[in-house]
Regions:
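Extended low-complexity intrinsically disordered regions
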Residues: 74-88
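Short amphipathic alpha-helix that is part of the acyltransferase structural core
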Residues: 1-46, 57-61
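Conserved beta-strand in the GNAT
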Residues: 59, 65-75
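Short, P/G- and charge-enriched loop/turn segments at secondary-structure junctions
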Residues: 43-48, 85-87
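A short helix-loop-beta-strand connector motif used in the catalytic cores of GNAT acetyltransferases and
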Residues: 47-58, 80
Length: 206
């Protein structure tokens, strides 16, 4: 069973933090070819300067397959005076950035929607109006297929992923609510027993 863990970096057990770093490395550094600053380099793991202690994470966890997806949520920082980039928000609107958003479609073809639902739920509870997220054409196609409200934005609005196209996602998502209403999030402590079993199973199976 897939469980969505909600935690902050400061509260994340070291075993889960290491597993997350390895997952991020496999997706973003090895898979997407992103470079890792040398001062943040840990062999086989991916971190960046935005991994602050108060940053929130959603982690999709499967008892046998380990981490299958994630999303990082933090306050969106308006970019500096960059030519060609206009800020698409009213000054009164509260915005979070959702970065490092990924999911293993081979495990669950709709996992991005599940993670996104929990992200907009967290944001709405915190009084946030919109999420800004990096997006791929495939992800935008999935959003359109499942009637997820979003608006394409220009690249450069997400400082932690400034080479990617971005989308503006309102926290009010009726179609996702219909699909996932009642789904809960878990603390790391609730999942840790299965974390230990999974890691032992993985090491024995290699």
């Amino acid at each position: 069973m897939m469980k969505i863990i909600q935690t902050q970096l400061k509260d994340m057990p070291s075993s889960l933090l290491a597993e997350l770093g390895s997952y991020r490395y496999s997706v973003f550094a090895r898979g997407e070819g992103w470079s890792i600053p040398s001062r943040l380099s840990t062999p086989g793991q991916e971190y960046d300067r935005f991994d602050r202690s108060d940053v929130s994470w959603l982690i999709a966890w499967h008892a046998r397959k380990g981490i299958c997806g994630c999303a990082r949520l933090m306050q969106w920082q308006e970019p500096g005076n960059i030519e060609g980039i206009s800020v698409p928000f009213d000054r009164k609107e509260a915005v979070w950035e959702m970065s490092r958003f990924s999911a293993r479609l081979d495990v669950d073809a709709e996992l991005p929607l599940n993670i996104l639902w929990h992200a907009v739920q967290m944001a709405e509870l915190a009084g946030i109006d919109y999420l800004v997220s990096a997006a791929t054409p495939m992800l935008e196609q999935m959003f359109e297929q499942h009637k997820v409200g979003f608006e394409p934005l220009t690249p450069g609005l997400i400082q932690s992923e400034d080479n990617l196209f971005a989308v503006k996602i309102p926290v009010k998502q009726p179609e996702l609510a219909e699909k996932y209403r009642g789904a809960r999030r878990f603390s790391p402590e609730e999942v840790l027993p299965s974390l230990g079993v999974s890691m032992n199973w993985q090491s024995n199976g290699r």
